[in-house]
Amino acid sequence: MNRSLAPELCAALKKLRLGPIIDTLPARIAMAEKDNVSFEDLLLVVLSDEIARRQSTAAFRRIQAAGLEPDMVTERWDATSKVHFDKRLYAELQSLRFVEARRNVLILGPVGVGKTFLACALGHLACLAAFHVLFIRADALLRRLRQSRLDNSRDGLMAELCSVDVLIIDDFALEPMSRDESRDMYQLFVERNARASTIVTSNRDTAEWLPVFDDMLLAQSAIDRFKNNAYDLVLDGESYRARLKPQVSSEGPLPAGKAVKTTKPTRSRSSR
């Protein structure tokens, strides 16, 4: 039967910041009466509901704050794609033990094979596990650091970048860096080394990163620290990005970032 809560109870729940319980409590009480659930067990169920809700809300906020692509999650990776990589290694990375061990991840491969997708998917898992994550393209990172020098906020920005549990730098080493940018990246790699996890995606192997830095000694020191504490995930194969192209269907356009499983076209009767 339908049950309404007493206004006094609703007011008390809201005062304790338990307002969301109001929507589910009547159903839980009805279930408890039907199944002869004790008050203690009912209280546990109700509080478990609220804990789950708060965890879900917190995870959603962490994902938003991280700047992750919302659709680049493990469940949406198209397993039929002709992109090749070490599935066993990626499964290990999905366990997030590398985050707990403060190890790094280097994701290498040509343009369009899904490096960003797999990096973001790891970021989503880390957010769900209550880790703080930041995803940022390398060019945007360097812009923020340049701006921070101008407005005297560099120390605060560097502290933020060094303290986040998982920092994902996308498309690193595409363009040469200035002397200041090289020093910034050196400091970032060195201060995060063995203290927090860094995921880097790049089209270039670490040996090709050296000319990108303005200072060869800084480059060698930074790269050596990063790569010797990193898992290497190497991707190869056909472009995964082509699967994210907009497609026409009876249901309208698919959301951006959602892969389309391609099928072989069937021959019409008239073509036979």
Pin down the residues of each PLM region.
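Walker B motif beta-strand of ABC-family P-loop ATPases
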Residues: V166
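Conserved adenine-nucleotide phosphate-binding loops and their immediately adjacent elements
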Residues: A65-A79
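Conserved P-loop
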Residues: F85-S163, L210
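Interdomain "pre-motor" coupling segment immediately N-terminal to P-loop NTPase/helicase cores
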Residues: K14, L18-E69
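Charged, compositionally biased N-terminal leader segments and the immediate start
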Residues: M1-I21
